[in-house]
Every structure is written in C-alpha cells, then in structure tokens.
Amino acid sequence: MSAQTANGDATEELAAPPVVDQPTWEAALAELRTREKAATRELDAIAAARRRLPMVELPDYVLEGADGPIRLADVFEGKRQLIVYNHMWFPGETWQCPGCTGFTSQFTRLEFLDSYDARFVIVTQGPIDEALAYKARVGNKMTWYSTADSPFGTDMGAPPGGGFQVNVFFRIGDTVYRTYNTQGRGTEQLSYSFPLIDLLPYGRQEEWQDSPEGWPQSPTYSGWASSEAYARYAEAT
C-alpha cells in the first residue's frame, strides 16, 4: 500500500497491514486471541511437566569467581535453586558472542529471584580475569564465574569453543543436582527482546519467518546489536 503524509498525499509504496474498520479489526484480534490463549495453556502444561522432571546428582565442581575458587554449591549463596547461562567464549577476542552479550545484558535487576529461593548467574570458559574485564566492558550486571579450570562447562554441554546453554540446578545441603537444560531457540522464552519484537507488525524481519509478501526480511540474526554496541550503550548510561 502507499504511505501517506498528514494531508493525505501518497509518498511511497510501503509494506503495511491492510486497513479495515474497527469491527473487522476486533474480530481478527479475537480470532488470534483464541490461539494465544491456547498457546499459553500449553506453555503452562509444559512448565508443569518441567516441574516433574527427575534430576541427576553432580560432582563437587569448583569454579572461579571474582574472589577466587568457589564450589558450585556455594554459587547458590544459600538459595535452593540456581539458573546458569553458559556464555560462549572465544579466547583472545576483545568482543565475545553478540548473542550471548545481548541476551545476558537484558538482566539488570535479578533481586526478584530472592523471593523464589533462586539465583541466575553466568558461567563461561574464559579465564576469570578476562571474563570480569569483558563484563565491565559491555556493562553487564550479572554475576560471572569461570569454568576454565573445571570440567563443569564441558559436562554441562558448553565445552571450550562450544555454544551457549542454560542449565538449572537444585541444591540439598552441599549436594547439587541438575534438573533442566535447554539451548538454541529454547532460550527465547527467557528473553524479553524476542517477545517484544514479535508483537510488531514486521516481527523479527528475518528470512525464515512466515511474513506477508513485501515485508522487510534479512538474514537471521542480522538485526542483532554487536557487542561493541552494548559497550556504547553502557557508556551512555
């Protein structure tokens, strides 16, 4: 359709949703809402099944934190539950994975997890001094630990040079158990960026998405901000 100026003059061809009257719009929205509610109920059922997963006992791993070596059981800081994001790491690189950087930069206030007896932290294969320097460089607010000298990362599916992972743990005394793991698109529901973008008429504007003809589309992830951009965002605040 043609975009229009304030006085109604056509300016250029622009991919846009069709214009309809209010009742037609409300009917289309109601039809979509039925599907959204069904998806929400299915997600509730999946979460219920997740709560019923068994767990596996882990060895007594030792990671490296800002204050030195720390047992995995102590990373919980007294909490019963722990979520770990295994951040990708490329040795010797100034700028690390932009996807991991962007994903973890969303989480600036995690105190709300206290009420749920839980923590959320980052573990990476990078040496702790380099990891903490990178955390500061990009303005990341999460707590970081290193698995560079521990088999923990590899055992959790995030070996040196490997991809990102999300792992969830449960603690009974000093014994830690692994309860859940996901990776790839399984992490999207943990992010607010994708749900926000998916509300937009154009969506993520990526080639794989099912969009109307003429909608802007680019290679997958091409719209993501670079790690350098997150550093600039941090400097601006």
Predicted regions: what is each one?
Residues Y85-N86, F120-G126, A131, T147:
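Short His-Asn-centered micro-motif
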